[in-house]
């Protein structure tokens, strides 16, 4: 995915100015940045097109998974899986559920009573079943326990290996993502998206901002 000279303004504030967006398929494209720089606005723009630069071919082919993405919370995991089985291919459900290790989640407990990590796994399943080619992850490991973060890292590594046609954009401020998941590395900095080929160099720049 390539968008040249991309500018994003929200409520009169310029977040990105004449920067080039280039995200590759078959790998995780990490975009890191400090709180408040506009990372979530960038994530939303792939769907909402506030910039007027996101083409219909992109907007119609994006799944955005963020803290504001919701699944029903007054049903159980078993009910959710049954509901999803009416809309999506059973083999795909089983495959993603296996990669997410969903068997460890009690199928009878209401989703609202599950841990944040368990809810996030069910959210990943629900949205990835849409099978869109562009997947935007907005702070999906934020506030999760370390064990769940490690499991999600492992899941993303396996998922992209098995789905090399996908473009996954991981918007985060969790630097552990960069070490745990190999990919391309970008920083949201000074109204630009800048690529770094060295994880250590990017982390150094990020810390010293």
Swiss-Prot record:
Q: Which residues cross the membrane?
A: none
What is any Pfam family matched here? ABC_tran
Task: List the InterPro entries.
Answer: AAA+_ATPase, ABC_transporter-like_ATP-bd, P-loop_NTPase
Q: Does the keyword Transport apply?
A: yes
- Gene3D superfamilies linked: P-loop containing nucleotide triphosphate hydrolases
Deletion consequences: Up-regulates expression of the LiaRS two-component regulatory system; this effect is more pronounced on modified competence medium than on rich or sporulation medium.
State the family it belongs to.
Belongs to the ABC transporter superfamily.
Q: What does this protein do?
A: Suggested to be part of an ABC transporter complex YydIJ involved in export of the modified peptide YydF. Responsible for energy coupling to the transport system.
From the Swiss-Prot or TrEMBL record, give the protein name: Probable peptide export ATP-binding protein YydI
Upper taxonomic lineage: Bacteria, Bacillati, Bacillota, Bacilli, Bacillales
